[in-house]
């Protein structure tokens, strides 16, 4: 399937797929979307709530599962976020981008860590890699349907192509597997705020919040596994 590089409104790049009329990140700002949806509303929220419950991350590292590794931007901004919180990050991707696309995306230069961005993409699949002193990365090449973890993760970044393009990635069955993969009080965050997506999340047991979205989107969703 044809893929093209697009410059988004905040100057960062994304990959555009003209056959689907879909982008890997928001055309209104790839970096802004990653920071708002996954860092500010996901990671920082979870850390704040966990610290209020006296969690010791040095003894119990934060475990993140990303649905849709894609360009590696979400992993990159997470690795750069907070050196006080050890993170074990598992990223699932069925169709990795190629080396040429990695170079053109240039997130390493944008964020001032070119070697780190190359390492994130060049390190092998299905193995654990130390990206920096507080961030471990495991990349798994498989489909969302193959995710079958149980009570394993604190936080899920759900970054699939939109439900209008690939509705099969936003079904009750997909969210049931995501719910099962989370620990109690685990959180799933996504840029999407579609009504059917919210209802599918609620159908499997998630408590779902509609929150202000990133630039170009009025709302986004955050779902919590509250037992």
Which stretches of residues belong to each language-model region?
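Conserved beta-strand signature within the Rossmann-like core of class I S-adenosyl-L-methionine
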Residues: 185-192
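Core SAM-dependent methyltransferase catalytic element
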Residues: 204-227
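Rossmann-like AdoMet
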Residues: 1-57, 62, 80-107
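Conserved S-adenosyl-L-methionine
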Residues: 68-70, 93
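A short glycine-rich, Lys/Arg-flanked "PGG" loop and its adjoining helix->strand segment in the class I
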Residues: 169-184
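Glycine-rich SAM-binding Motif I of class I
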Residues: 72-76
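Short SAM/SAH-binding signature in class I
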Residues: 137-139, 152-160
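S-adenosyl-L-methionine
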Residues: 103-149
